[in-house]
Amino acid sequence: MISHGKDIKIFTGNANPALAQEICKLIGIKLGEAEVKSFADGEASVSLYESVRGSDVFLINSTCKPVNDSLMELLIMIDACKRASAGRVTAVIPYFGYARQDRKAKSRDPISAKLVANMLTASGADRVLTMDLHASHIQGFFDIPVDNLLGNPVFVDYYAKKFGEKCENMAVVSPDVGSVARARTFAQKLHMSLAIVDKRRQKANQCEVMNVIGDVAGKDCILFDDMIDTAGSICNAAKAIVEVGGANSVYACASHGVLSGPALERLSSSVIKEVALLNTIPETMGAGCDKIKYLSVAPMFAEAIERIYQEISIAKLFN
């Protein structure tokens, strides 16, 4: 690593320490010494066991389950670093929770993503580094720099090696209209055709698949989305691709494996052959489902952190 006069320090909370360790190993530094624990009543407590004065500090903590605990850990870590005279604090949030609450869907709804942005800024964060925000316009909720890395290259590399020349006879399928832009870019990179599943959502976390737009008959398909929560949408989409569209087989991939409630059971019993997830959320969340394969985003975050530290553009990571 090239130094430019100030130390780099990386700390992690309890949300995804394995990813933080992997990032530090790639950069070639030790993970900072800190303790993030809870008092008997559940309050988060942070202790930094090394100086951060004047340092370029990166705090790694996905705001995943337990979501509110993970968020409070991050906020308190930021505050601790600022009060200890850190030169700059970057909140590294591989999975940004509350991103689905980015607008008022009905009367009197909160815009929780904006609230979280305000909280991160108020706590003292100087910039945010994240990946595949559920809604990219959330970057505009902040008054500080936000770098939203894309997981697309990781999946493109994986499937290009997995399927090789077969890619030209495969299809990428968006599970809904909202994911079409992501799926289109993914399909173009792999030289695959594009299809869309049209669905009608009945209530939260449930949906009814209606139709498949595009030709998937006889093809091996990849369902592409930004996250899998309860897995209802992805499993119903896969079923429609096979039963309605006549696809030969279905694979699935998503940047964030939230995997709540019945997700693992649904994926295990679905027609999906394999589910590729990024490790923005701990791999332990997928334990118990043999179909799940995790791909590491540590190299991408490590390079982004090094570039931010060295004051070099990270535009390369978006191309």
Please tell me what each predicted stretch does.
Residues 1-319:
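PRPP-associated nucleotide enzymes
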